[in-house]
Amino acid sequence: MLERLHSVPPTAPAAAELGRRLARTHLAGAAAYGVGPEGWEGDGFFGPLSAPLPMVLGEWASWGAFYAEARVTPLARMARDAGVYDAAETTRFDRIAARLATGELDTGEPVARLHGDLWSGNVMWTEGGAVLVDPAAHGGHHETDLALLALFGTPHLAHVLDGYKEVHPLADGWRERQGVHQLHCLLVHAVVYGGGYAQQAMEVTRRWVRPGAH
């Protein structure tokens, strides 16, 4: 029998505790970048329950290679095939994937155990604290979960981050890398909804693709 949870308004102390618990979850680790939960076979799913998109799972030795090959490139191709981007625009995602694959944006930290779809709608605030729902769990970079919390406006986000950093300090430059860590989610939304999400994803490439890069 499942326990019924009742929502309450979020508070700063609850947000800080969410940050601490999330950091501990990340520190529990995973066997490799891109690996699914223990016992899971095949790929996963990401996006709205009404039309989930495939989420590639596997094993990668570095975060940059994993994120380029299993997240950015497949979704950019999907967006192109859906008519969201033309060939020239898709090339910009290829360039950012190439930069990721070099390991330039890796931070040298251990693989984190991610929720994987940690936007604000998947945080339920209850009397017992925050409860995370609807995971797309896999091994990844801890900054990805934090970037998704920021993407759609999580309540008391500053307190979440403060609590997180009590347990796990963040590497220099983490704020600048947020857009890259949001890119997969933005591309999913671009495929499903188009519109402003497609533009937001393109803005990330303008920040991270060097002028004249091929």
Language-model features: locations:
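Hydrophobic alpha-helical segments that form the core
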Residues: 179-187
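ATP/Mg2+ or Mg2+-diphosphate-binding catalytic cores
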Residues: 189-214
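Active-site catalytic-loop/activation-segment of kinase and kinase-like phosphoryl-transfer enzymes
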Residues: 43-101
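Active-site Asp-x-Gly
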Residues: 63-65, 77, 107-113, 120-176, ...
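Hydrophobic packing residues in well-ordered alpha-helices of helical domains and bundles
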Residues: 15-18, 89-93, 201
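Protein kinase-like catalytic domain
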Residues: 26-30, 165-168, 191
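ATP-binding pocket architecture of kinase catalytic cores
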Residues: 1-65
